[in-house]
């Protein structure tokens, strides 16, 4: 009888990026974005974020 795969309930691998599906560290969850940092950099300006100098 084969073992059932263990499903993570918490930690890095639980939530994927909403845009590309990347799983792991680098996920931005603030304000309910749920985007990886690469996707956030690509669309941050469209979302209304401004880069400060």
UniProtKB/Swiss-Prot annotation:
Key words, A-Z: Metal-binding, Ribonucleoprotein, Ribosomal protein, RNA-binding, rRNA-binding, Zinc
GO biological process assignments: cytoplasmic translation
Source organism, top-level taxon: Archaea
InterPro entries: Ribosomal_uS14, Ribosomal_uS14_arc, Ribosomal_uS14_CS, RIbosomal_uS14_euk_arc, Ribosomal_uS14_sf
Cofactor binding: number and manner: Binds 1 zinc ion per subunit.
Single GO molecular function: structural constituent of ribosome
Name of a matching Pfam family: Ribosomal_S14
S-S bridge residues: none
Cofactor requirements of the protein: Zn(2+)
GO CC, any one term: cytosolic small ribosomal subunit
Binding site for Zn(2+): 17, 20, 36, 39
The protein's role, per its UniProt record: Binds 16S rRNA, required for the assembly of 30S particles.
Family, as annotated: Belongs to the universal ribosomal protein uS14 family. Zinc-binding uS14 subfamily.
Subunit and partners: Part of the 30S ribosomal subunit.
Name of this protein: Small ribosomal subunit protein uS14
Organism (species): Methanocaldococcus jannaschii (strain ATCC 43067 / DSM 2661 / JAL-1 / JCM 10045 / NBRC 100440) (Methanococcus jannaschii)
């Amino acid at each position: 009888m084969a073992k059932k795969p263990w499903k993570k309930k918490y930690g890095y691998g639980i939530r994927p990026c909403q845009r590309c599906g990347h799983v792991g560290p680098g996920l931005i969850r603030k304000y309910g974005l749920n985007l990886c940092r690469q996707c956030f950099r690509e669309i941050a300006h469209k979302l209304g974020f401004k880069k400060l100098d």
